[in-house]
């Protein structure tokens, strides 16, 4: 790819969703404008997933690329135009006749994603067992939740070097090896079945990596256990509660078919969010979403949100940073060797802090420098000086003294308070 093509591709990436309104900030945001290397809006600092951007094709490409070169190729299709794998997500449309006085109208419900099972009744049961606000019905809160989790749990920059900011050839190679490794060892997609349907596999069957979804190997004797399974009590691997007869369960092949989950319990062990489209990563007997699995394997830059493949990076405030990305969150100036203040877990340089975030002294009405001592009571602050922290009536210095606060004013005595009331 030549330089002109690369620059054009980068420009198109930054034009995507340009001007889209923020669902969180509403009118406070002028519209989405992607930061050059942070994965946020330059105007409101919210993520792309917080904006009303139509990303269905992009998300389908991202998940399609995730499943490429895995056992889940049945879930993707390659476009003839560019050969890019697209995720064939299962969309479910339910039609319910609604009786009216004269006619019978049809109520149609479209799920933007549903488990890819042949039994639609089972898929419908699965959906009903999810919290209402997490059911991906088109145009609903649940559909917005799914869209947000696709962006959070499966960031494109965790699998595609071209989505990252200025990786070296060595870092690109390391990332490609890392992605190949997690595809082979951890990535999986849950299966929805009735617990009794798995009895045919036998209790001594095991998963073989690299096989197709139906591959299993018999170990030991294969005697008939049907009578034993008839009275088996199944319990959820997450909540330990029993499974009701006839309710669908989720199985994770990498975990083994001796484990099963309620639909609402198939969650990441770190963020506890539903695993979007039942895509999971299995490690140390735990389920992870893509983001938190990668976090357990590699440090993540708190500035650009990308995994760090360089040997040189910095640690500050219990977070990891690319050396070039330890910058002021407001002005992007590099902070190495500079004074900074953490604001909502983001580092801000001293000038930006004083300009944008510093509290104002109730005495002199100037911003309080972060390195200067101050007195704070409720939402009010003062410079801890003889010029500012004074009785609002007689101007007596109150440092180290008892005082009476009244709506931003402070008094040294009841008498002074009465004189000002």
Curated annotation (Swiss-Prot):
Residues 92-199 form the PET domain. SUPFAM superfamilies: Glucocorticoid receptor-like (DNA-binding domain). It comes from the Eukaryota. InterPro entries: LIM1_Testin, LIM2_Testin, LIM3_Testin, PET_domain, PET_testin, Pk/Esn/Tes, Znf_LIM. GO terms for biological process: negative regulation of cell population proliferation. Keywords: Cell junction, Cytoplasm, LIM domain, Metal-binding, Repeat, Zinc. Gene3D superfamilies: Cysteine Rich Protein. The N-terminal and the C-terminal halves of the protein can associate with each other, thereby hindering interactions with ZYX. This is Testin. It comes from Eulemur macaco macaco.
